């Protein structure tokens, strides 16, 4: 469905038509990124995402035009949605996965809820190399969504809570780079570092325009800790 420009557009607009929300979020998936980078991506019923083998050499030499062409239906869908009269005076939210969360899926080849290798965190060189490549193509993916008509970008870090060490290197720094990139494009950016714990420090370092918090976090506490623009 994510690669069917007509159906994904219709699914995106359904909540607007029914509930008159003031913004729509595109129907897509954060795993469109590894798919665009050449890694096989599939979904098993009852099990969730399943990715193919990771070929770092192939990823290091990926052609940007090939990436753009593979994800062309996604951008065409966004363009179709943004031009629909129903979205007049409403925002269209595009999104990506944060570099760390994309890396987790690409290396682990499945949701870490199902299985996370004990040695996952041991190959620091692989992690650092892959984060650089992922960040590069996330920036391209973000730019393409904005060019197609997205007026807000959201960054989902679904597995931020997995890290106990190296949070600055693996989460804060690459996410800050994305946030800064979006701001240069003059588009608001929202972050959701699920399970991060220290939202104040995250916001102080990464400096998003908005932040989502976990369902079990007291919003009154967050309001006192974080500077609200």
Task: Describe each region flagged by the PLM.
Residues 1-9, 61-63, 102-104, 111-112:
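An N-terminal domain-start capping segment
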Residues 46-84:
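A gly/proline- and charged-residue-enriched helix-loop-helix capping module
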Residues 70-229:
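Active-site loop segments of alpha/beta catalytic cores
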Residues 39-56, 191-196:
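Flavin-dependent oxidoreductase catalytic cores
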Residues 30-33, 48, 57, 99-101:
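A short acidic, glycine/proline-enriched capping/turn motif at secondary-structure boundaries
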Residues 1-43, 83, 87, 172, ...:
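N-terminal basic, low-complexity leaders that serve as flexible interaction/assembly modules and, when applicable
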Residues 1, 55-61, 164, 218:
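Short, solvent-exposed coil/turn linker segments
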